[in-house]
Structure formats: structure tokens, C-alpha cells
């Protein structure tokens, strides 16, 4: 099975739980044993690829800036790529540039995804019950790519993935383990990056 094969399942859940006029946002990056798999919460309409007329890749954070600033600050993307991102307005992100950014993510052996793939109009919080509908699919995603470590953003996402109550503030530099298909993965819960949030994990 490939990551691509999961898209039809995500699209069904978008119809059920997402904004009717927007498409699912899937994932992007290195799909072959990445060093880090980043798991965010769920996409919003700020991602230019959520528009139904968009025919390019539908990966997280396209047409936005804050997350890329964060990745640059912890040396996960090059200064050259970061500067090009900063120069662009959302409407200037064309298919070619989106591929260029994710080529960098792939080359750095990173994979970016969301627990929930159901795109919302804005950053409204989703109830646990909705995010849990995506858990089995996320585990399939992880099983396909086999990341070395997983970083989960925020209490809600971390708690659902680890199946126990997690307070990120009490988990600085600590990891938990999950088992998926007889493989064990280290999971590091970190603060959800709001604005210029920073990772609470040493590189």
C-alpha cells in the first residue's frame, strides 16, 4: 500500500466532517523512512490547495508562512527556501513553487501530515470524536512511511494518538511509545505552534 491509496478514504471523511466547498489536505514529504513525521491537527481554508479548483499537490501549509518560519528557525529548511516563501503572497504560490517547497521537505527527510484531514473554513477546534475517525488512517500512513520519530502538536492530537491524557507542558523532552503493526515508534508531544511558537524538543 502507498500513502496515495489513502486519499479516497480521506475524501469520504471530508464530505462528512469538512467544509463542503473545500477539499481534503493530505500530507507531503519523504515517504521512505523519514527522520521525522510531524503530525498537526487539521487543515484550514487558508491552505491554497484546499480550493476545489486546485489541481496541484494537496499538502499541509501551502500558501502560509508561520510554520515555515518555525521550520527555518530549527534548521529544517534552508535559508534560500525560507526567503522565497517569505517573499510570496498566498496567490503567488503556483504548482511549481509548492512542489519546490516539498522537494526541500523530502530532501531533508521530513514528512508533514495532519491527524484530521477534514479542511475547515477557519481554525475552529474539532471535537475528539471527529479526530478519532482519522486515527486508523493515520496509523496506516505511519506504517507505510516508517518514520524514525514522530512529533505530535498540542495536547489534543498527542492525547488521541497516544490514547492517554497528555499535557505537553509536563512532557518537555520526553517521549512515549506507540506500536503499529509490530513496529514501535517514539512519539514526542510538543506545543502547538501558534504564531512564532517553538518546538520544546532538542534537535
What annotation goes with each model-predicted range?
Residues 178-181:
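Active-site-adjacent alpha-helix of alpha/beta-hydrolase-fold enzymes
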Residues 169-176:
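Catalytic phosphate/metal-binding cores of nucleic-acid and nucleotide-processing enzymes, i.e., regions
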Residues 1-149, 155-169, 185-198:
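A polyanion-binding, active-site-adjacent surface
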Residues 201-203:
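Short, intrinsically disordered, charge-balanced linker/junction segments flanking boundaries
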